[in-house]
Amino acid sequence: VYKRQIENSTKANSLRMIGAAETELADYKHGVNTPNDIPSMLSIAASYEFLPVLRASVEYHFFDDKSAGMAGGKQEFLTKGTNEYLAGIEWDVTKHLTLSCGGQITDYGLSDNYQSDTSFSCDSYTLGFGAKLNLTERAALNVGYMWTTYDDYTKKSQNYNNTGLSGTNIYSRTNKVFGASINYRF
């Protein structure tokens, strides 16, 4: 496990929550160090070339998040480490054009006590597509698009934000990413 400290370098703290005690903002004050270890990781991968122009690969990653120290002992609230399952395929359509696609499933060991409004995770799946266009013998244009959909995580509370009332938070998000690059080999 690699240990690291994240230090806030806040010039002005203008964040104010109505009715919030000063202690609610203590983690974000200038100079506060937040421990967050990098977990150990196991990775297994295999690839196969079906034809000289058609390749596929599969991977599995395990992150031992439950053993990595986090601020406030947050890792204790995980039920297990993170599992990632990946697969992809690449096809050289011509000597100038390569197409690819792949997917990833991520499964965290989440619990209600792990999730908060300032830091949450959600299980997800990702689909991606890409193309490589060889412009010259040394230069290539790469483009790609990926879409990650996260499972909603519902957290119910009998004392929502210390109001004495019951309430529900639904943690969710979606990522859509486009990328383009020109690669040059020297």
Predicted segment positions?
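Outer-membrane beta-barrel porins/channels
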Residues: 3-186
